[in-house]
Swiss-Prot record:
It comes from the Eukaryota. Keywords: Disulfide bond, Extracellular matrix, Retinol-binding, Secreted, Signal, Transport, Vitamin A. GO terms for cellular component: extracellular space; interphotoreceptor matrix. This is Purpurin. Pfam families: Lipocalin. The keyword Secreted applies. It comes from Gallus gallus (Chicken). InterPro entries: Calycin, Lipocalin_ApoD, Lipocalin_CS, Lipocln_cytosolic_FA-bd_dom, Retinol-bd/Purpurin. Residues 1-21 form the signal peptide. Disulfide bonds join C24-C182, C90-C196, C142-C151. GO terms for molecular function: retinal binding; retinol binding; retinol transmembrane transporter activity.
Amino acid sequence: MKYAQYVFLASIFSAVEYSLAQTCAVDSFSVKDNFDPKRYAGKWYALAKKDPEGLFLQDNISAEYTVEEDGTMTASSKGRVKLFGFWVICADMAAQYTVPDPTTPAKMYMTYQGLASYLSSGGDNYWVIDTDYDNYAITYACRSLKEDGSCDDGYSLIFSRNPRGLPPAIQRIVRQKQEEICMSGQFQPVLQSGAC
């Protein structure tokens, strides 16, 4: 009986230790090592998203990334958005990316603008948490931090090269990465019907 109690207490201690070890401080999140923008370039389709506060693309989200000769990455993206609570339109956005620290090229700063006056413009951190370049990419942005360093208002997109989805083995990788950025269970599927 004493052995069973010992095993039970040891397993509880281990679980508590693990949960305390996992931090949601944004600065602790790992990003894609040796990120290569040229391999990342091309068309991506959003399959799932965690929205920030405010207006955000709703569905049929896609992005086409291009790397210029000087290494600058740009993107043109599309997606449907609901305006004024009832008007659903396809919106076009454009973005330019800069790398503040060349030692971590997966941590970029994105300056974006809506290509119509009623769409927002601004800038966000844009981190590529993980990608295999051929199938999936997980991006992350935190707009504001809490006092403890965790994200107060952020968003994330799960991209695929194929608008139809990801194979089960890659879905497992994506779920693990969602946990690592403290967003497990917060994603909504993104409809890809070809509307935009």
